[in-house]
A protein has these predicted regions:
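Bacterial N-terminal signal peptides that target proteins for export
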Residues: 2-11
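Cleavable N-terminal signal peptides
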Residues: 13, 23-24
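N-terminal signal peptide c-region/cleavage motif recognized by signal peptidases
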Residues: 19-21
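Gram-negative and organellar
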Residues: 28-30, 71-72, 82-783
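Long, intrinsically disordered low-complexity tandem-repeat segments
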Residues: 29-71
Length: 783
């Protein structure tokens, strides 16, 4: 089982730091660097779009409210809040980031304490505050601050948040890190042959994140200050992962599994700051340690895949290796000096080193016995080093004109050695061990960035901002080794009046790459023996056209418009529009065109000092066009081998095109009414409608039929109403009602049973169809 058995663990563990953990921790990964600015344009895969980012956008404030900066109790104020919450049903919409819990009645407490204030309004010499929020509820948090005003400042905080995704699916597997099937499991070649009564284990998809943070700042004198920060973060729970089962791409099968999550991240930072008004400097040290308590997931193959007794049920065991432990040390320094009244110079740099902190997982045979194959090393002793340098010259040659020059350098240096790692792709004697060895690729990168920008204020209230960036990126072990990008930006603040303001922004990016060496990956990954056995016209790991230019050649243009109008003291109107277009001008296959648009209109009206109302309309549209090419003949007729009348990879009649159009419309309105000094009400309503269209078209071949995928419709109604009553100066009551009506018809889950896809063991997850009522009663006492 390729990529799904224990024999692959050590290979994945050995290369993980090179491709994932260290890259994402120590700076942008090579893939991100190669993609350049196309990352934003191409980020939405079809699967991600089909899963629906609309829900995430609709509930956005839920996460923001929970994860946002913790409130600090006002100086001299203290309060106690008692909460009672009733929820009518369990759901995955309101509870995606749990703030309350499941169905039923829940209780919570908020406590806020603050330093006393002197009679004349002067605070005490030591200011402190304590906030304990949502005690007894899933999304609880706490914060303590202390400020001596003379020297010491301390900020200690803790927060906990639970993410509960749709867990209505079922699984036949038992266990946590070693998933096994029941003793009476009857395997089959397809999922519809399984006994559905044995698929009865809940599929847990909850994830809990806890974060503890301490920040201390000590002022030594008028110009020197020391700051330190410690942060501990722990994540536990499960994520849903799809795992593949196959050997040499033959007879593939798949399963959906709950992947355990149990990891800790430690951050420590120490810095020294100097600032005398003319010269500023700082020295700093950062440390990050990642500790993963879950190393590998194994599971029984539930299928009879025809891959041999060693790979099929019950002996076949698949495996997945998680991120290894690693540590990062970073040293930083910066300095700035005011050379003259019109010129300031700044310089900063950093050096970072990331190392893997654990030995590799032993390589094992597919039948579970210890493999008689030696690994080149038991531990990766190299390091990934990231060096940065930035220089800025800030000038103001004229009273209304500022001109700045900036230069940045980034170096990603990988000191890991290259090794040939043994790999067993299938049953014995499929190919010799020497032939199937895979080389790791220590990725290096160097990037130079130049920026020139100007800010010009004219006498007629017009302000013009111009910016030009040039990026040059060189990398090894990549099909495109060199990219150059020019970025232009123009922003104009148009003349208007005190009540009417306009802003126009234009951007254009041009990314160009060197020649796409499509065979480079084949020669760098595989052994010389395998290369010599492979015909010269078949030495490639990817189709020559599929990703040839899509990530390294593109033209992007964008426009933004903002108008704010206040016809009088009561009205405020705002109109905003923006659109982006990315043209992958040299792509024949793959992603070829991306268009995004966003328009927003909002209005607010202040009827009186006690009554405010507002409304808004928001529209978003995204269009992505991808082109694919179908191949005949399978493994014996590679796409780049000439077969009459065309080479398969060059026959345009076998093209097919996928157009993905996503739209989301939101309409909302709200009211805030203070009846009198004691009674106030507020209410807001929003309606969201989203549609995702997948249009598939064939290009002429008789045996290719373009059949569109079903549209995905998403609807959300949200109503939030509050009644606030102030009984006295110290006592107040709040009654809140939240109503949510959410439903979608996502075809990827709707009516997709456990055995709907014959070669994939699914989960039978249900689509959300929620009607949610939540009542919250709060009693606040100030003292």
């Amino acid at each position: 089982m390729r990529c799904s058995k224990t024999t692959r663990i050590s290979i994945l563990s050995a290369t993980w730091l090179l491709t994932t953990a260290a890259a994402s921790m120590a700076e942008d990964s090579l893939l991100k660097a190669a993609e350049g600015s196309s990352l934003k344009a191409a980020e939405g895969s079809l699967l991600q779009a089909a899963e629906g980012s609309l829900l995430q956008a609709a509930e956005g404030s839920s996460l923001k409210a929970t994860e946002g900066s913790l409130p600090k109790a006002a100086e001299g104020s203290s309060s106690l809040v008692l909460k009672g919450v009733w929820l009518n049903e369990n759901n995955y919409t309101l509870s995606r980031y749990q703030r309350v819990g499941g169905k039923g009645i829940h209780g919570g407490v908020d406590v806020r304490l603050g330093a006393p204030v002197r009679a004349r309004g002067q605070p005490a010499s030591n200011d402190w505050s304590l906030a304990l929020l949502n005690l007894g509820l899933p999304a609880n948090a706490a914060r303590f601050t202390l400020d001596t005003r003379d020297a010491l400042a301390l900020d200690l905080s803790y927060r906990e948040i639970t993410q509960q995704l749709n867990n209505s699916g079922l699984s036949p597997f038992q266990g946590v890190e070693q998933l096994v099937l029941s003793d009476n499991w009857i395997a089959g070649s397809h999922s519809d042959s399984f006994d559905q009564g044995l698929i009865n284990q809940p599929l847990n998809r909850a994830l809990v994140r806890r974060k503890l943070q301490l920040e201390v700042s000590q002022r030594i004198n008028a110009v020197w200050q020391m700051t330190s920060q410690i942060e501990l973060e722990k994540q536990t729970g499960h994520r849903l992962n799809g795992m593949a089962i196959y050997t040499n791409a033959a007879n593939p099968h798949g399963v959906l599994l709950p992947k355990p999550v149990d990891q800790q991240t430690h951050h420590f930072a120490l810095s020294s700051l100097y600032n005398d008004g003319t010269t500023a400097a700082s020295l700093g040290y950062h440390f990050t340690g990642f500790n993963n308590h879950f190393r590998a997931l194994t599971w029984q193959n539930p299928f009879l895949s025809g891959l041999g007794t060693a790979l099929d049920y019950p002996a076949g065991v698949g495996s997945y290796v998680s991120a290894p432990d690693y540590s990062t040390h970073q040293w930083l320094a910066s300095a700035g000096h005011q050379l003259t009244n019109r010129i300031r110079l700044t310089l900063d740099g950093s050096v970072a080193s990331t190392r893997q902190d654990e030995n590799l997982i032993p390589l094992e045979e597919i039948d579970g016995r210890q493999a008689d194959i030696d690994q080149p090393v038991d531990r990766l002793d190299g390091a990934l080093r990231i060096n940065t340098l930035r220089l800025a010259v800030l000038t103001q040659p004229l009273r209304r004109l500022a001109v700045n020059f900036r230069y940045g350098f980034k170096q990603r240096k990988n000191s890991f050695q290259r090794y040939a790692w043994p790999s067993i792709w299938g049953a014995r004697n499929d190919t010799s061990d020497t032939d199937l060895r895979i080389n790791n690729r220590p990725l290096d990168l160097e990037q130079d960035t130049y920026r020139l920008d100007a800010n010009w204020r004219l006498k007629n209230r017009t302000r013009i901002q111009l910016r030009y960036d040039y990026l040059r990126t060189a990398r090894n072990f990549a099909a495109v080794s060199l990219t150059r990008e020019d970025r232009y930006a123009l922003t104009v603040y148009l003349p208007g009046s005190v009540r009417l303001k306009h802003r126009l922004s234009l951007t254009m990016n041009d990314l160009a790459g060197s020649t796409y060496e499509w065979s480079r990956g084949f020669f760098q990954d595989f052994s010389t023996d395998l290369i010599n056995q492979t015909p010269a016209n078949q030495r490639w790991t990817n189709h020559p056209l599929l990703r040839q230019y899509s990530l390294s050649n593109q033209e992007k243009s964008g426009i933004q418009w903002l108008t704010t109008y206040q016809p009088d003291s009561a009205w405020t109107l705002q109109l905003k529009g923006e659109t982006d277009w990315v043209n992958f001008d040299k792509s024949e296959l793959g992603l070829t065109d991306v268009r995004d648009a966003h328009f927003n209109f909002s209005a607010s009206y202040r009827h009186s000092s006690r009554l405010n109302s507002w409304g808004w309309v928001d529209y978003r549209a995204s269009q992505r066009r991808q082109t694919g090419r179908d191949f005949l003949g399978g493994i014996n007729k590679p796409a780049n081998v000439s077969l009459p009348p065309y080479p398969q990879g060059s026959d345009p009649s076998r093209n097919y095109q996928t157009d993905q159009d996503n739209t989301a419309t939101v309409v909302g309105a709200g009211l805030d009414w203070q009846f009198n000094q004691r009674l106030a009400v507020s209410s807001s309503y929003s309606w969201l409608h989203g549609r995702e269209i997948f249009d598939i078209q064939a290009n002429g071949a008789r045996d290719l039929n373009g059949e569109n995928l079903p549209n995905i419709e998403t609807q959300l109604h949200s109503l939030d109403s509050q009644l606030r009553f102030k009984s006295s100066e110290r006592l107040s009551l709040t009654l809140q009602h939240q109503y949510l009506r959410f439903a979608d018809n996502n075809w990827q889950w709707q009516n997709v049973s456990l055995d709907a896809m014959r070669q994939v063991l699914g989960s039978g997850q249900r689509n959300p169809n929620d009607v949610i009522h939540q009542l919250t009663f709060s009693l606040q006492y100030r003292f």
